[in-house]
Amino acid sequence: MRQQENFLESMQSFFPLAATLLGYLIGSLSFAVIVSRVMGLNDPRTFGSKNPGATNVLRSGSKTAAIVTLLLDAAKGWLPVMLVRWYGKPYGMEEGTMALVGLAAFIGHLYPVFFNFAGGKGVATALGVLLGLSPILALATGATWLIMAYFFRYVSLASLTAAVFVPVYYVFGDGMAWYLSKGVLAALCAMSLLLIYRHAENISRLIKGTESRLGKKARTERKS
């Protein structure tokens, strides 16, 4: 009986770890690179900001490729969280594990094992994670991004502002839209800090006034 209890306890530790690893591997799929290859576009790591993300794919001149990249990058943040939500409870995985798995997917996008750990900045993937954790939180964050992008035309500034407000929204929404979880808050803070860190060069360009505005295309559009 005691051995059976020990086995069950060890399995309860194994499942969250396995889910976290799976989340990281899903996050490591760099769809900006994959979609660009499939659609015959230049590698987004070779032009514009050299960032493998939807915004830089848009600079290639293909709106379709950018939209597909955006949706897939968001989906890879959303899916691991939802898998835990749908199937995790019998295995001891609840809200804290969902946040951990989402963070792992986000880190996978930033440092993808399949692409030499050279990834994007994680904005779309972070939004997908938020959508899995709380659609209301994702809506508030997305609205913040849209407002900033519309008025200032800087994707990076919109992303940075949204990142700062994510944990703020989560704290102030406690007791109204959700009940605060320290594990979720820690994951959100970690995502926000990592996203800001990945935008260090953008911050420098914003200060210097040399940051590219939304809609600016790269010179090279398609493979020759």
UniProtKB/Swiss-Prot annotation:
It comes from Albidiferax ferrireducens (strain ATCC BAA-621 / DSM 15236 / T118) (Rhodoferax ferrireducens). GO terms for cellular component: plasma membrane. This is Glycerol-3-phosphate acyltransferase. The keyword 4Fe-4S does not apply. Probably interacts with PlsX. Keywords: Cell inner membrane, Cell membrane, Lipid biosynthesis, Lipid metabolism, Membrane, Phospholipid biosynthesis, Phospholipid metabolism, Transferase, Transmembrane, Transmembrane helix. It is found in: Cell inner membrane. Catalyzes the transfer of an acyl group from acyl-phosphate (acyl-PO(4)) to glycerol-3-phosphate (G3P) to form lysophosphatidic acid (LPA). This enzyme utilizes acyl-phosphate as fatty acyl donor, but not acyl-CoA or acyl-ACP. Pathway: Lipid metabolism; phospholipid metabolism. Belongs to the PlsY family. HAMAP family: PlsY (MF_01043). The lineage of its organism: Bacteria, Pseudomonadati, Pseudomonadota, Betaproteobacteria, Burkholderiales. One of its GO terms (molecular function) is acyl-phosphate glycerol-3-phosphate acyltransferase activity. The chain crosses the membrane at residues 14-34, 64-84, 98-118, 127-147, 160-180. InterPro entries: G3P_acylTferase_PlsY. One of its GO terms (biological process) is phospholipid biosynthetic process. The keyword Iron-sulfur does not apply. It is a multi-pass membrane protein. NCBIfam families: glycerol-3-phosphate 1-O-acyltransferase PlsY. The gene is plsY.
